Amino acid sequence: TVLSCSYTPVDGVVRVYDLDRLLSPLITGVMADFTFTVGGSSQTLHLIQSRTRVSMPAADFLDSHFLSSVTSERDTTMDRKEMVTLLSPTEAVNITATCVYANGETCVPQSVQLASALAAGQVHEVDCSPSLLVNDALGELVQYTINAGERLMTFRVSPTQTHRLALLMRNNFGAWEPCYFQGMNEHDPKITRELALVAGSVRPLKIDEEDTCKSYTGPLRPGAVQLFRDLARAYEVKLLDGGVATDPLVISDAEVKHTDDDGSLPAFTFSWRRAARTSAMFDVPVIPRIFDDTFDETFN
């Protein structure tokens, strides 16, 4: 219960201001239902989260867009996890990927169905990673467009791009969305010590380490600017390791300044740490195996 009290009307009207600030912390994902009861009469509202103002009515946006701030072509690679999230208010939708394969000097189009008859009024998260669309018989996947009714999202598959950090965040609309950093990571562990004089000697009583990392996006295409601005305001962020969400983390600072100069490429920086009290992590190297357990260990 958020508002449970008596109100005194002014000129016969009761106004509750900043209702969005009261309800926003209660919406953990994309959508939440709230029931308002006044004088025994109730009305239920279905609220869709958006942390920024959108330049079109909610119904029009939901019918024509995925729940993402990215509206132009995106870059991806074969080892990346990609996903789209949608909410169709009134009708069931099918999701297809229109792929383009390069085979020598020929481009071969091919349509692949990813999901069918997704129910209306529900939030649907669909995996559209490029690894799911590989077709060696047709050639090398170079581009694909995700289609869901009027909604479109185009990915350009790069054979050369790499990333040094992958994060999964709840974006502007509360939907999970991955983002990839191509720049370097700058580690800046901060160690604090509490010392005391014990039996004539100075001894450390407590040593704490806060493992902070500063990550650089590298040059961004214009369409990625809004994605990383979403990351700067995100409340929930996780590390993405091999396409799997792992440790929660906290963004402590973000530099997202950019211009509209056609000759400039924006590049942002983010400072972050793991959310756990012990933020330092020791990654144990694993020796790769050549053969599985059916072979003699001598060969490994």
Where are these regions (language model features)?
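Extracellular/virion structural assembly segments
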Residues: K81-T90, T98-Y101, L118, C128-G139, ...
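Preference for solvent-exposed, low-hydrophobicity sequence contexts
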Residues: T1-T160
